Amino acid sequence: MILISEIYFYNVTLGLLENIMREKILTALEKHAQGHIEKHRINIEVYLTNPVGIGEHSDIIETIEKELDEIARYQDQLDIIKKYFG
């Protein structure tokens, strides 16, 4: 026979596990976005400090704009996570 206290314990434990998993997923999403932001930021730094060293990118401005678009994409993800799930 299952006691009410056992059901309560099970529900509390399940709820805690769900919260832990939720936080781990959100943290992973945030770190993923932050990593991509840093990657694209560093690319821009390279283009700004040594534009002639990047032979396959003849239009530096356009190339930097593409990197900025990627930063904006991942920053939007971070903003949404914080606003709706944080």
Report each predicted region and the residues it spans.
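Extended, charge-rich alpha-helical interface modules
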Residues: 22-86
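Short, Lys/Arg-enriched N-terminal segments with co-localized hydrophobic residues
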Residues: 2-20
